[in-house]
Regions:
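Class I SAM-dependent methyltransferase SAM/SAH-binding core
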Residues: 46-48, 52-99
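A short acidic, Gly/Pro-enriched loop at the edge of an enzyme's catalytic core
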Residues: 97-109
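Conserved class I S-adenosyl-L-methionine
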Residues: 1-40, 54-58, 137-158
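A short, aliphatic-rich alpha-helical micro-motif
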Residues: 39-40, 103, 125
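Conserved SAM-binding loop
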Residues: 3, 69, 140
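A short glycine-rich, Lys/Arg-flanked "PGG" loop and its adjoining helix->strand segment in the class I
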Residues: 122-137
Length: 158
């Protein structure tokens, strides 16, 4: 399986976005999403669809003991390793559907702006549930269609 983010033209345009250049401070949703984070001190964290690894780095800054960031895109993982490297963070090129979610392994699973790409969302939710430790937290944020809708799109009337 390949990722649209491995397409050079698409990736080059993505790299121009404020979130790519400025990290979390350049992401419009960050300040609301940040408020949902639990205490990560000493916790194991999984970031599914980690992109540039900004949330992985934030988790370490908040005291996480171990963080794994997975993303289907080789280009994204390359950037994550370049921009957000830390001994407590491991990055892996892997699709969400293909990851072997070990049972009760993570205190927190992060998914920011990625699950809208997944066809079988129920399967991913079940896998995430299994991989969370008791009382674990799943932080989920998806893209609203208004954000990606073109300004010249026509309405469909029924």
């Amino acid at each position: 399986m390949s990722s649209i983010y491995d397409n050079k033209q698409f990736f080059d345009e993505y790299a121009k976005m404020s979130r790519s250049k400025q990290g979390l401070a350049g992401a419009g949703e960050w300040y609301q999403f940040k408020a949902l984070f639990p205490d990560l001190d000493g916790k194991n964290v999984l970031d599914v669809g980690c992109g540039y690894g900004w949330h992985c780095k934030y988790a370490v800054e908040c005291g996480a003991s171990k963080v794994l960031g997975i993303d289907l895109s080789e280009k994204m993982i390359h950037e994550a390793r370049q921009k957000n490297s830390d001994p407590k963070i491991a990055y892996r090129v892997c699709g969400l559907e293909d990851y072997d979610y070990p049972a009760e392994s993570y205190d927190c699973v992060i998914s920011n702006l990625v699950l809208h790409y997944i066809a079988d969302i129920d399967s991913i939710f079940k896998k995430i549930y299994v991989t969370l430790k008791p009382n674990g937290v799943f932080l989920l944020n998806i893209e609203h269609p208004v954000f990606t809708a073109g300004v010249n799109q026509d309405w469909i009337y029924d």
